[in-house]
Amino acid sequence: MRNPIWFMLVLGFCLVRASASFAAEHQTDAEPSPELSLQGKAFYNQFCRNCHGISMVNAGTSSFDLRKFPHDDRARFINSVMNGKNSMPPWGDILKPDEIEAIWAYVRTGGKT
């Protein structure tokens, strides 16, 4: 390359962008607001309760026990809801992103909202 300073600036910019993107993707979520958790409870009762149960567990079924879902794994939760997993159907065409976020907020409370 003819201009090593230009190359270093571009490389530095790319590294900063990549690290910021990685940090944003892997950050631990702050505690959800009570309002968002209450909205999530309503969506949970409408869309999730039949399979996952009133208390986030449905004994005697193959449904995942949501009480045990890692509270720091938002990306996994969003992916599972959007695309489905095992016997869970995908909800990405039915639920809006803000509704999924609200359900995630409720799940993080362990059903204590």
PLM feature spans:
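Bacterial N-terminal signal peptides
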Residues: 8-17
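Axial heme c-ligation environment in periplasmic c-type cytochrome domains
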Residues: 59-67, 82-113
